[in-house]
């Protein structure tokens, strides 16, 4: 089997297959984070059979591909938890067509809290020694895990030691490349990092009543 994957309206292959009635994407087109997986005979010249993964948007496409990854034995935690990946000589497909549902919760994710005590130190000392900080290489692994868990939302580390997320430009690019929506938590009202960006000696107390 070949695997053909792409997003409706963004992938030439997927749009061609739909225009030739090889696949019917009407059920998911325009939806939020949906995907379809279908076994297609003779999808394009030279390929007798293919598994086609079509997503309604970027995350839908990713979820479809990663659902196949999970089905063949790759745990979403393969990297973070050293979950072993069982090697298989052959993988079989049991269904001809599958269409996912729209997630019942629109935004699903995590907040990296109190990273000073663990994740920041590990990243600085082991994974991003050259940067000496919690940066894009670490965020790439976090974002990959989120996609593999079919999540889409991340409130980043924000302590003074690990810096505000946007202070390292590559962080934003990494999050966007994984189609992860970035949010903010208690230390970042209005996307301003009070833990590291508010300078009391120059800006005064963080107190609206007395320091407007």
Task: Identify the function of each model-found stretch.
Residues 1-102:
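Contiguous, structured surface segment used for ligand recognition
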Residues 7-16, 104-212:
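Aromatic-lined carbohydrate-binding surfaces of glycoside hydrolases
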């Amino acid at each position: 089997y070949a695997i053909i994957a792409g997003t409706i309206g963004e992938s030439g292959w997927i749009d061609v297959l739909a225009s030739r009635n090889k696949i019917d994407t009407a059920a998911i087109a325009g939806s939020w984070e949906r995907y379809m997986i279908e076994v297609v005979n003779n999808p394009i010249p030279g390929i007798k059979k293919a598994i086609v993964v079509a997503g309604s948007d970027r995350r839908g496409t990713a979820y479809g591909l990663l659902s196949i990854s999970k089905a063949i034995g790759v745990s979403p935690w393969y990297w973070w938890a050293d979950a072993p990946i069982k090697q298989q000589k052959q993988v079989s497909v049991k269904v001809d067509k599958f269409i996912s549902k729209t997630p019942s919760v629109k935004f699903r994710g995590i907040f990296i809290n109190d990273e000073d005590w663990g994740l920041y130190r590990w990243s600085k000392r082991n994974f991003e020694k050259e940067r000496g900080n919690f940066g894009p290489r670490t965020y790439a692994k976090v974002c990959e895990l989120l996609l593999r868990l079919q999540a889409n939302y991340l409130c980043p580390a924000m302590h003074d030691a690990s810096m505000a997320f946007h202070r390292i430009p590559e962080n934003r690019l990494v999050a966007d490349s994984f189609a992860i929506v970035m949010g903010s938590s208690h230390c970042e009202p209005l996307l301003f990092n009070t833990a590291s960006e508010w300078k009391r000696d120059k800006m005064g107390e963080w107190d609206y009543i007395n320091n407007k």
